[in-house]
Amino acid sequence: MSGDIVDETIAQRSKIYGDPELSHENIGLAWTAAIQQHYGVRLDHPLPAFLVELMMVQFKAQRAARVFHEDNYVDARAYLKFAEADQRKAG
């Protein structure tokens, strides 16, 4: 990889998994449904993409706390990049 590893990782994963913003929005919908079903509550809004991304940063941090693997840090930085952009858009 010749450029920024985070941007290259995002581009590479986008080719495999598709549009990350759409994916993160869909994950938010799925997680909202799971939370509502499990707790028997109704949320006013689905989890926004930026919150999904921040939760994924926490997931990667927990993995990194267990054992070093560079991928955890690269992915966490990518999720933070998405979260910053999406939260700015959300206002």
Per-region residue spans from a language model:
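Intrinsically disordered, low-complexity regulatory regions
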Residues: 1-91
